[in-house]
Amino acid sequence: MAAKIRRNDEVIVLAGKDKGKKGKVTKVLATGKVIVEGINLVKKHQKPVPALGIQGGIVEQEAAIDVSNVAIFNAATGKADRIGFRFEDGKKVRFFKSNGETVSN
């Protein structure tokens, strides 16, 4: 099945500590999770690796969030929206269910 949320989509968080925040999808994982820019930040304790020039310390990075907890953001309506699929000129395209506009990739 085609993915409803893809890389570089603008999404809004529906649940969790970052509810209501918007961000861009940087990675879609096969486990049904997405990594969103600036959302779900966690602190990771990085061990130093002098051979590779990696400095140790506490670093902040984005953790994965379940795809069910995000929705694509429709700029035309200014709200979260649902995605549908249809065929246009023999190609399968995504569209917003609220206003029928196609999603630009």
Swiss-Prot record:
PANTHER family xref list: MITOCHONDRIAL RIBOSOMAL PROTEIN L24
Species, as recorded: Vibrio parahaemolyticus serotype O3:K6 (strain RIMD 2210633)
Family matches, as InterPro entries: KOW, Rib_uL2_dom2, Ribosomal_uL24, Ribosomal_uL24_CS, Ribosomal_uL24_KOW, Translation_prot_SH3-like_sf
A Pfam family of this chain: KOW
Source organism superkingdom: Bacteria
Family: Belongs to the universal ribosomal protein uL24 family.
Protein name, as recorded: Large ribosomal subunit protein uL24
Recorded GO MF terms: rRNA binding; structural constituent of ribosome
